[in-house]
Structure formats: C-alpha cells, structure tokens
Amino acid sequence: MFDGIGFMELLLIGVLGLVVLGPERLPVAVRSVTGWIRAMKRMANSVKEELEQELKIEQLHADLKKAESKGLSNLSPELQESIDQLKQAAQSVNRPYQVQDIPAQENQIHNPASQSVSSEASPTASSAPTSEPNQGEDTRSNPKANG
C-alpha cells in the first residue's frame, strides 16, 4: 500500500501523530484519514470502470464500422441478425418522441357524478332558504347594537 515508505517512516509518522494529537484524538484522526483514503479509492475505481466501459463501447462501434466497410453480405446469418437488431435499437433511440393519435373522447376526463345529476334535481339559489337581515335597524350606524 505504501510504496517507498518503510517501517521506520511509518513508525516516525505514528510517534509524531501521537505527540501532536495526543492519545485521545489520534484514533479518531486515523479513522477519518482511512475513510478518506477508502472514498478516494472507490472514486478512482468507479472512474476506471466507467472508462473501461466507454472503451469497450468504442471498440464495438469500431468493429461495427469495420464490418460495414467490408460489406455486410459476407457475414453469417447470426451476425447479420444481430446487426439488424442493433440498427433497429439505434433507430428507436434516435427517433424523436412521437405522440400517438388518440381520439378526442379518450383524452377527456369523465366525471360520472356530474353526468347523473339532472337540471331538475340540482339545487338552485332560488330554492335555497334565504335569511333576511333585521329590517328596521341598521347595525353599522348604531354602535350600541354592535357591542
């Protein structure tokens, strides 16, 4: 893990850490440093894997272009079928989003409750009981009536 660092150098770093941080904070510092090292290793491995995957994809594209340049008629039927499937998949990815034609009735939101209520059965403002204000007294102008 530590290329170029010998046992004596590690011992010296440990003693200096013990002197500077003390016995209480040294284990916490070592744990945090090892956590950072693990995170950096994970990040480096993920970048490495992504690059390898991209290189494989590029190699496959190069092989496909090479096969196309040689002529697709010389290929075996299995390879021809797989190339056709790849082309269909590429066309489906490259095609823009297409809206299917749906009749207008299917696009409407149906509300069965509003369809079952007829105009005769629906409550109107004229059939609702009305409450009339007290006639004779104006409560806005009479402060004694308000309080």
Swiss-Prot record:
The chain crosses the membrane at residues 2-22. Residues 112-133 have a biased composition (Low complexity). Residues 68-147 are annotated as: Disordered. Residues 71-97 have a biased composition (Polar residues). The Tat system comprises two distinct complexes: a TatABC complex, containing multiple copies of TatA, TatB and TatC subunits, and a separate TatA complex, containing only TatA subunits. Substrates initially bind to the TatABC complex, which probably triggers association of the separate TatA complex to form the active translocon. One of its GO terms (cellular component) is TAT protein transport complex. It is found in: Cell inner membrane. The keyword Zinc does not apply. Pfam families: TatA_B_E. It comes from Shewanella sp. (strain MR-4). InterPro entries: TatA/B/E (IPR003369), TatB (IPR018448). Its main location: membrane. Part of the twin-arginine translocation (Tat) system that transports large folded proteins containing a characteristic twin-arginine motif in their signal peptide across membranes. Together with TatC, TatB is part of a receptor directly interacting with Tat signal peptides. TatB may form an oligomeric binding site that transiently accommodates folded Tat precursor proteins before their translocation. Belongs to the TatB family. One of its GO terms (molecular function) is protein transmembrane transporter activity. The keyword Lipid biosynthesis does not apply. Gene3D superfamilies: 1.20.5.3310. It is a single-pass membrane protein. This is Sec-independent protein translocase protein TatB. Keywords: Cell inner membrane, Cell membrane, Membrane, Protein transport, Translocation, Transmembrane, Transmembrane helix, Transport. Signal peptide: none annotated. GO terms for biological process: protein transport by the Tat complex.
